A protein has these predicted regions:
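Short, solvent-exposed loop/turn segments at the edges of secondary structure
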Residues: 113-117, 250-251
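N-terminal (or domain-start) structured segment
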Residues: 21-89
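Short beta-strand-centered segments that line the small-molecule binding cleft or hinge
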Residues: 105-114
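Hydrophobic h-region of N-terminal signal peptides that target proteins for export
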Residues: 11-20
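Pocket-lining segment of extracytoplasmic ligand-binding domains
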Residues: 90-92, 100-101, 126, 163-262
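Bilobed "Venus flytrap"/periplasmic-binding protein-like clamshell domains
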Residues: 31-57, 61, 115-184, 279, ...
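An extracytoplasmic/periplasmic, membrane-proximal ligand-sensing/linker region
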Residues: 177, 183-185, 194-212, 222-229, ...
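Bacterial N-terminal signal peptides that target proteins for export
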Residues: 1-8
């Protein structure tokens, strides 16, 4: 979706009079645009569920998810004021906050979404068992514009591997295209991240089953030594069909970021509402079980990066100082 189309879709963060009545009073609705990613991936799944639970919990909100190209488009759209809030993977967020390859961003964190443990999935009948086995093979590294190829690039760099030189790297136009490419043999492996990630679930749930490939303990240590911002993460046993043991790997936290000038009062209300629906959100979507106020404080690189209205609410409930 290009910027022009997004601008034409509607004015952002509108306070509009709703038809609903509350004791004879017109309810003022705050409309909030939420950028997600391409269809078929984890971000639209999460974003749609987020909007549903938030809108159900607070009738004054109208959160509207929109498909975009993903993290690398969401950041400039937020900075241009053409989205109110958006889902952003950990690596693009890290680069934006640190000013790597670009000026430092003034965007702020609304909430941590979930941790994103990175790994590959292959067919169970494939001969590939290690990352080195995939060198020279066709690998789908995720959708163009998403954070997944950035995470894989950092991890492979920690092992001395170049994503576009040591692999036949393929970037998808739609995140949902990856599983079929693994299953029909067009690619040897699909890179992804997360617990309950749709691409992994599709391959693991297929008739032939799947095997996951993650860095071993020595490789994790090598990657961590070079990419210090990546965190050791675990995919618990049973996260995917026929996954009998836990998988240790590395990854990062994805965030919902807010445009720099998002009203502090609106952000405070969003944080308060989200805190109130943490359990309901978890029941609706497994990935959302990590979307908590406490995890946001832990996952944020610094409290100064948390939106001021959100931080004010966190201090009120005692999860932040």
């Amino acid at each position: 979706m290009n910027i022009t189309r997004i601008v034409c879709t509607g004015v952002l963060l509108l306070a509009a009079s709703a038809a609903a009545q509350d004791g004879g009073k017109v309810i003022q609705k705050t409309t909030i645009s939420l950028g997600t990613a391409t269809p078929g991936g984890g971000f639209p799944l999460y974003g749609n569920a987020f909007a549903e639970v938030m809108n159900d919990a607070d009738s004054t909100f109208s959160i509207l998810p929109r498909n975009t190209k993903g993290s690398t488009e969401n950041i400039p759209l937020l900075e241009a004021g053409q989205l109110d809030i958006a889902l952003v993977a950990g690596e693009p967020a890290y680069e934006a906050f640190a000013g790597i390859g670009r000026p430092r961003t003034s965007l702020k964190i609304l909430t941590a979404m979930y941790s994103s443990p990175g790994m590959f999935v292959v067919r169970a009948d494939s001969p590939y068992k290690t990352i080195r086995d995939l060198v020279g093979k066709p690998v789908a590294f995720g959708a163009r514009g998403s954070g997944l190829p950035i995470l894989s690039r950092y991890m492979l760099d920690g092992l001395g591997l170049k994503q576009d030189e040591d692999f036949q790297s393929i970037y998808l136009d739609r995140a949902g295209d990856g599983p079929a490419m693994v299953l029909d043999g067009r690619v040897a492996a699909l890179w992804g991240a997360g617990i309950g990630w749709p691409g992994f679930a599709a391959v693991a749930g297929s008739a032939g089953g799947a095997r996951f490939i993650a860095p071993d303990a020595g490789e994790i240590a090598r990657i961590k030594a070079k990419q210090t911002f990546l965190k050791p993460l675990t995919v618990p046993a049973g996260s995917y069909p026929n996954q009998n043991g836990q998988i240790d790997t590395l990854g990062s936290w994805s965030f919902i970021l807010a445009r720099a000038d998002l009203d502090d009062g609106v952000a405070y209300r969003l944080a308060r509402t989200l805190h109130g629906v943490e359990s309901a959100f978890c029941r609706k979507l497994a990935q959302a079980c990590e979307t908590t106020a406490a995890n946001t404080v832990v996952a944020a690189p610094g409290s100064e990066l948390i939106q001021a209205g959100v931080l004010s609410y966190f201090r009120e409930i005692g999860v932040a100082k």
